[in-house]
Amino acid sequence: NSVIAGRFMPEFLEHRATRILRSRFNITATKVVKNRWLSADDIDLLIKVTILMSAMGANKTGSVIKYIARIPHESRGRVLWLTPTITLSANTIQRLRDAGIDVTGYKELTACEKRAGLLEIGDFVVFSIQSLHYTQKDYGIVVIDEVEALFFTFGKDAATHQDEETKEDRLVHNFARFKEILFKCKKLLLMDVFITQTTIDFVNNLAM
């Protein structure tokens, strides 16, 4: 795994601090980015899991969008962009479309259409984690924005994983599907302003 550390703490950019971070969180490789903003060039093409950790406004989302846009359509496979909230999904969809990327947004479909498989009719989909039970296909690239908040949805507030119409609990199904998708994908990009040991352990335990 690799961590791209941004300028969210000046002292973090010191060599010693980076070394401490790596040892504390069992990270095999780190890359400190001293520029103010991240870019697509900062994302390692050869490593399956990349964690982009930086302050808000450091261009995490923008760098990932450009990274994906550079990959030839026929070789990148299907792309899944997961978020913890509807609002963040809507914002991301607009940014992707502004970048010229054709994307399917789950709020643009009815529950009936999603159950019929229309959510995955395109090869680039964006939705919040609670709708994961509608998916069946594998994905070459998976992006998780605000990964810590996304993991939190699997905690005590399981009500967030209820079916929007039937109110059926989808928590177990969503989590099982979540692990399956991450295990099978070729590239996993995680983004947040901070990363906990729980997230690092989860990624390592996927036996990638």
For each feature predicted by the language model, list its residue ranges.
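Modules that initiate DNA replication and primer synthesis
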Residues: 1-12
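Pre-Walker A adenine-sensing motif
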Residues: 17-46
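Walker A/P-loop
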Residues: 46-66
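Conserved Walker A/P-loop ATP-binding site and its immediately adjacent core
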Residues: 76-98, 195-199
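Structural recognition of the conserved hydrophobic beta-strand(s) that form the central parallel beta-sheet
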Residues: 81, 125-128, 143, 186-193
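Inter-Walker segment of RecA-like/P-loop motor cores
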Residues: 96-136
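SF2 helicase catalytic motif II
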Residues: 136-190
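Interdomain hinge/linker at the junction between the two RecA-like core domains of SF2 helicases
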Residues: 197-208
